[in-house]
């Protein structure tokens, strides 16, 4: 399907923009003096090993497949891919989460099986995070090794079972460093989650973990979906190995612009966390250059994934 775009002028002809290029147009268009955007889909990103992650791709670093206890899970997963198609998102880094927390051993094992199934159902579109509860120690580590190895998962997803500075989390981080994979960590700095999620991590906790493990690749989830996002951005200013996922609120303005100004565009990674149009819109609407938008939309995540060791 093509979307007509009217040009200025009473008798100007119509141009058609495909749904696929709707998102990419803002990042790949030529800028001010006609300089072409440097990244193209055919060129590998410098410093990234050969593989399926190329410059020009749009990667959603934070997506979820539907838990199979929901009767509509197949339809919901298909809708996720359809939305990505319409918005020009090439690949989605997905986890499946348990509907109740803390996750049990059987619960997160089942979720990872379903994520692997999603990768098979949508080959090349869905990339998997291995979701674990660190409290299961050896079993959690074995699960990560199994799914990053045998199933090709690209990283680890941690939720709110433990604050990230608790020692029970450290073996997970050390394994992530060994494997060279990122950890996407659920986070919020908000008073209204305290009762329901007493062990929620925030930007300060992630900054502390980053100082303890400077080799770790940490992603702070949904910077604008967890309460005081300005506080979170400032807390992570000097945590150079923490990347900020742009997903979150559908109402807060200027989160991407502030994050770019405070921590720099090289540490921002595009995410939607299921709020697809809002996730895309905040990048399109940011007061950044085409090259900077492309870094956020894909290149920064590509670089993280390219650091994999095993």
Positions of predicted regions on the chain:
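N-terminal secretory signal peptides
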Residues: 1-17
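Acidic/histidine-rich helix-loop elements
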Residues: 64-75, 101-103, 193-195
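C-terminal segment of N-terminal export signals and the immediately downstream linker at the start
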Residues: 36-66, 70
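Active-site gating/metal-coordination segments in enzymes
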Residues: 90-91, 106-191
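Glycine-rich, proline-tolerant flexible connector loops at the mouths of alpha/beta enzymes
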Residues: 96-107
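N-terminal export leaders
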Residues: 18-35
């Amino acid at each position: 399907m093509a979307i007509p775009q009217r040009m200025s002028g009473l008798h100007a002809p119509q141009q058609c923009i495909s749904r696929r290029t709707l998102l990419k147009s803002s990042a790949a268009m030529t800028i001010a003096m006609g300089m072409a955007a440097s990244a193209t889909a055919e060129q590998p990103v410098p410093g990234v090993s050969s593989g399926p992650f190329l410059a020009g791709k749009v990667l959603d670093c934070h997506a979820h497949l539907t838990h199979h206890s929901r009767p509509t899970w197949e339809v919901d997963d298909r809708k996720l891919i359809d939305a990505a198609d319409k918005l020009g998102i090439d690949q989605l880094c997905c986890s499946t989460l348990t509907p109740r927390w803390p996750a049990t051993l059987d619960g997160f094992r089942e979720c990872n099986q379903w994520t692997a199934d999603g990768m098979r159902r949508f080959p090349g579109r869905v990339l998997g995070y291995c979701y674990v509860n660190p409290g299961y120690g050896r079993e959690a580590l074995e699960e990560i090794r199994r799914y990053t190895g045998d199933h090709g998962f690209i990283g680890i997803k941690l939720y709110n079972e433990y604050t990230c500075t608790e020692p029970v989390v450290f073996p997970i981080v050390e394994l992530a460093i060994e494997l060279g994979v990122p950890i996407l960590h659920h986070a919020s700095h908000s008073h209204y989650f305290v009762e329901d999620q007493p062990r929620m991590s925030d930007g300060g906790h992630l900054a502390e973990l980053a100082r303890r493990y400077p080799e770790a690749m940490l992603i702070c989830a949904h910077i604008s979906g967890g309460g005081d996002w300005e506080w979170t951005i400032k807390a992570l200013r000097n945590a150079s190995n923490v990347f900020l996922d742009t997903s979150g609120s559908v109402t807060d303005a200027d989160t991407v612009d502030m994050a770019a100004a405070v921590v720099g565009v090289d540490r921002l990674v595009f995410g939607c966390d299921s709020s697809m149009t809002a996730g895309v819109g905040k990048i399109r609407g940011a007061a950044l250059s085409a090259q900077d938008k492309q870094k956020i939309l894909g290149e920064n995540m590509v670089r993280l994934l390219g650091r994999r060791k095993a």
